[in-house]
Amino acid sequence: AWSNSLFEDNAEHGLGMHIGQKYLRDQAIELVEEIAASDKASAEFKAAAAKFIETKDNTRENSPAAEALIAELEKAANAGCEKSKEVLAKKDYLAKKSVWIFGGDGWAYDIGFGGLDHVLASGENVNVMVFDTEMYSNTGGQASKASNIGEVCQFAAAGKEIGKKSLAEIAMSYGYVYVAQIALGANPAQAVKAIAEAEAYNGPSLI
């Protein structure tokens, strides 16, 4: 799924999407555990539920486990299990979702920095990718907090007199945020590796 937000509310919007689907998923997982604990649950259902719970934090492995669980839930629902019907109403939220928040440097370093900082500090398992052009690209090319010292832009011909804000170091200061800097054109393999590591990390990530 894809959703656009107001420019300055990007981080908060992404976090809200994550928390909303997480809440619905937690409700469904609680019901699955209740059904599996019942004496009426089949051995196949118990096995599918156990595999689903075991892999619930692994995006890659949880998707097939969720599909297998849904098949067992449908059998149980057809046999009259009301709780299975409740879970099936939320089946789109069973598989672990990967949440990515995309934005430019004008948003991340400046107008949306407060929201970005709040999201990273929350500890929630969301990923943020900042496309850093090192200037205000949307408004024609002015120097920004992302611009390097001495940088000349379209509307900053004299060069920037102060250094670049270190977004990576600010995020690293929390101690629990995965942080990587990539240059796709310079090292595609490292870029893919960093994205995979960010996805696998159970916590906030910033690339």
Model-based region annotation:
Residues 1, 77-142, 186-198:
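Thiamine diphosphate
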Residues 4-16, 20, 24-44, 58, ...:
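Conserved thiamine diphosphate
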Residues 25-81:
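Low-complexity, highly charged intrinsically disordered N-terminal segments
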Residues 63-67, 92-95, 143-147, 170-174:
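Generic detector of short, locally flexible boundary/turn motifs and exposed helical patches
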Residues 69-76, 85-88, 167-176, 182:
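An acidic, phosphate/nucleotide-engaging active-site surface
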Residues 118-120, 124-158, 162-166, 173-178:
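Active-site cavity-forming subdomains of large catalytic enzyme subunits
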Residues 205-207:
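Active-site regions of oxyanion-processing enzymes, predominantly non-cytosolic
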